[in-house]
Design a protein with these regions (language model features):
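Vicinal oxygen chelate
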Residues: 15, 66-113, 121-124, 139-161
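Core segments of cupin and vicinal oxygen chelate
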Residues: 2, 9-50
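Short acidic/glycine-enriched loop/turn segments that link adjacent beta-strands
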Residues: 35-40, 60-62, 97-102
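Conserved beta-strand in the GNAT
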Residues: 52-54, 105, 115
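Eukaryotic phosphotyrosine signaling hubs
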Residues: 5-7, 61-66
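Short, charged/polar surface micro-motifs in flexible loops or helix N-caps
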Residues: 47-50, 59-61, 71-76
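Short, compositionally biased
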Residues: 128-137
């Protein structure tokens, strides 16, 4: 069912230091992030995989997660909902991102946080947009800290170079 890893998010305590390390020492290319209200930086790992850095003061990593693009977002959404695996606590409800990709967070049996995403143009069951677990717009943390490289046209998917 999983088609590929889309991105990995790491929680950091100093965005600037971490971003400098991944760009200068690891050779990753910075790419625009969505316009979140908290410090974040996105990097291209491959044409289809990104590293996301988010600055938080978490004592346990309940926001750090693995993101996978799935073949059929709607089918998996309903299956995970039935199993009670959808977790809206760390990053909010199921959403359509500005680029059109869908986003949901689930917990695996061990409690690891996994983000499910679709391609921006994938067909999505319209009933999901009326579900109590769906919410319009980007997640808002209330921090109003907009540090990091961000753009209105950010996407999880980049064309091959």
């Amino acid at each position: 069912m999983i088609a590929e890893i889309n991105h990995v998010t790491l929680i950091v305590d100093n965005l600037e230091a971490a971003a400098t390390f991944y760009e200068n020492e690891m050779g990753l290319e910075p790419v625009p992030a969505f316009v979140f209200d908290y410090p974040t930086a996105f990097f291209r790992i491959t044409d289809t995989t990104q590293l996301h850095l988010s600055e938080w003061e978490d004592t346990r990593s309940f926001r750090g997660h693995l993101c996978v693009r799935v073949d059929n977002f709607s089918e998996l959404f309903y299956r995970m909902k039935k199993q009670g695996r959808i977790d809206t606590a760390p990053w909010g409800k199921v959403r359509r991102l500005p680029d059109g990709a869908m986003q949901a967070f689930i917990r695996d049996p061990a409690g690891n946080l996994i983000e499910l995403t679709s391609f921006p143009d994938d067909e999505i069951d319209p009933a999901i947009f009326d579900d109590e677990l769906y919410e319009e717009g980007l997640y808002v943390s209330g921090r109003n800290d907009f540090r990091g490289y961000k753009a209105e046209n950010a996407t999880l998917y980049h064309p091959k170079k």
